[in-house]
């Protein structure tokens, strides 16, 4: 997941005050996407709302995503329709994409350090493209998989320059979700999760990335069949979760997965917020 971004409006999205609000929630279905589990009825819109509210009450909204949340507010009108993009964006789409690439298979701290080192060594993307691959590898080595990631970044920049004659992805802001997915999928090393993160964070689109934390929690709650893999989980959840809940719910599930010992596979994180397994707000949703 990317780090915090930018937005102006101080207020955060208002959560519904009563369960009756859920009746107004749209189903968020995408006409062009196919649900691999059309007969699996969960999660319902009401369940998504309830989980969102329970996690929000338990954790508060994660500070690392607060600025992205503000961006979403100022890029939409009163009824939630997307309008013009914020004018004060500090992070370009290309920056966000590379940042997400560097976050693969490493910790948040290491990926942030790798991106900072890359930008320090090569201030512009033209500098990165002109650099030797070994130099890029050295700059991002702290993030792991340096050779693979350096090759992916170089290939992305090379193909982008050939296609658009400049190193810029801002044109994606004018495309539909399906068009954005088609564009980014052409680049080697950019998978569904990376695309979904860019859609949700940099482009303020309604998408629901599925990382390890979200995947494990979704399976534990029975939101997908036990045999589901991450790609099918992504397709199913994007069909089932209402668009207006996707951003908050995704950020909260990701954060909860990092902090809750009960929800962490193999009990890895010892810095979890919950000292008592029974305090996990998701226990009542588990199968």
Please give the residue ranges for each predicted region.
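N-terminal polyanion-binding entry modules of DNA glycosylases/AP lyases
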Residues: 1-175, 242-245, 251-287
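Catalytic DNA-binding helix-loop module of base-excision-repair DNA glycosylases/AP lyases
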Residues: 95-102, 153-155, 167, 175-224, ...
């Amino acid at each position: 997941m990317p780090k915090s971004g930018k937005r102006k409006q101080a207020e955060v999205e208002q959560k519904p005050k009563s369960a009756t609000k859920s009746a107004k929630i749209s189903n968020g279905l995408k006409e062009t996407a196919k649900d691999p589990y059309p007969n699996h009825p969960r999660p319902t819109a009401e369940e998504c709302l309830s989980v969102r509210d329970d996690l929000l009450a338990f954790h508060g909204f994660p500070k690392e995503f607060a600025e992205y949340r503000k961006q979403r507010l100022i890029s939409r009108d009163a009824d939630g329709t997307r309008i013009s993009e914020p004018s004060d964006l500090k992070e370009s789409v290309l920056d966000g994409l590379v940042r997400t690439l560097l976050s693969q298979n490493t910790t948040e701290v290491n990926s942030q350090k790798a991106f900072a080192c890359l930008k320090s060594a090569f201030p512009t993307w033209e500098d990165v493209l002109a650099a030797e691959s070994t130099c890029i590898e050295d700059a991002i080595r702290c993030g792991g998989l340096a050779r693979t990631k350096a090759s992916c970044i170089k290939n992305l920049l090379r193909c982008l320059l050939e296609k658009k004659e400049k190193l810029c992805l801002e044109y994606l802001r004018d495309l539909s979700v399906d068009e954005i997915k088609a564009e980014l999928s052409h680049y080697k090393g950019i998978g569904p999760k990376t695309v979904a993160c860019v859609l949700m964070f940099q482009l303020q689109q309604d998408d629901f990335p599925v990382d390890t934390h979200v995947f494990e929690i979704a399976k534990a709650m029975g939101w997908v069949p036990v045999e589901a893999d991450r790609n099918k989980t992504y397709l199913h959840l994007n069909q089932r979760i209402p668009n207006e809940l996707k951003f908050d719910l995704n950020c909260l599930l990701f954060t909860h997965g990092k902090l809750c010992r009960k929800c962490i596979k193999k009990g890895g994180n010892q810095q979890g917020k919950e000292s008592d397994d029974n305090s996990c707000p998701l226990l009542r949703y588990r199968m």
